């Protein structure tokens, strides 16, 4: 019996992302994905059992600054995006949308969802956030509008230095986790669960969310991030 083939993730420049077609569906998936991703970030925070490394930093900064967590997410996203310049990275449409919308979605959810009390409810919230994050990340990746600013930073360093993505990711995420914890961010069960399960969760849903693009675009391509060179979007934190 022939196996059903799923659409592939493609290396696209920002211009190719626009020319790849199916824009209404892709834009819808992009913003639904980012909204779910931001909501999941907020639920992790409300659960109080620890967040993803970058969110530990976001939360830690929010305890020291008169700014909402969403505002900090947006501002830090722009700072990370500036680091793309010496790496000669090119942001995609999804990269810009990520910077602008993720923090707004997180703030709206934090306004709607009160702090969660009781260990059983907190664990249930973490589990729900992992699923929501996985769906959101898969929709975002499947729209094929470029990596998030933090993943683009990692792939840019990889392309310029030749260091492994695993090493770069580990160094960056351990660093932001440590800084965030020192600033007052929460590290706990949710942090460990995110590290272990967000990759499999996103990968599971990705099989249904990758949008089929035009064949003419499929035959060529250089991914947003580094013109003319492949720049694989990591599945684990593609919306980071």
Across the structure, where does each feature detected by a protein language model lie?
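Core subunits and conserved enzymes of cellular information-processing
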Residues: 2-240
């Amino acid at each position: 019996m022939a196996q059903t083939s799923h659409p592939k993730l493609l290396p696209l420049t920002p211009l190719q992302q626009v020319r790849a077609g199916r824009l209404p569906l892709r834009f819808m998936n992009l913003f639904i994905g980012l909204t779910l991703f931001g909501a999941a970030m907020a639920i992790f925070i409300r659960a109080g059992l620890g967040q993803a490394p970058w969110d530990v930093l976001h939360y830690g900064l929010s305890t020291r600054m008169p700014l909402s967590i969403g505002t900090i997410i947006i501002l830090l996203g722009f700072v990370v995006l500036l680091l793309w310049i010496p790496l000669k990275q090119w942001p995609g449409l999804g990269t810009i949308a990520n910077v602008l919308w993720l923090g707004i979605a997180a703030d709206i959810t934090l306004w709607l969802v009160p702090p969660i009390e009781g260990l059983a409810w907190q664990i249930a919230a973490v589990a729900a956030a992992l699923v929501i994050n996985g769906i959101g990340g898969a929709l975002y990746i499947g729209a094929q509008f470029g990596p998030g600013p933090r993943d683009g930073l990692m792939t840019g360093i990889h392309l310029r230095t030749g260091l492994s993505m695993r090493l770069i990711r580990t160094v960056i995420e351990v660093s932001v986790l440590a800084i965030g914890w020192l600033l007052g961010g929460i590290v706990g069960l949710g942090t460990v669960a995110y590290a272990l399960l967000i990759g499999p969760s996103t990968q599971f849903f990705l099989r249904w969310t990758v949008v089929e693009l035009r064949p003419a675009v499929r035959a060529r391509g250089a991914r947003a991030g580094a013109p003319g060179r492949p720049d694989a979007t990591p599945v684990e934190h593609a919306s980071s």
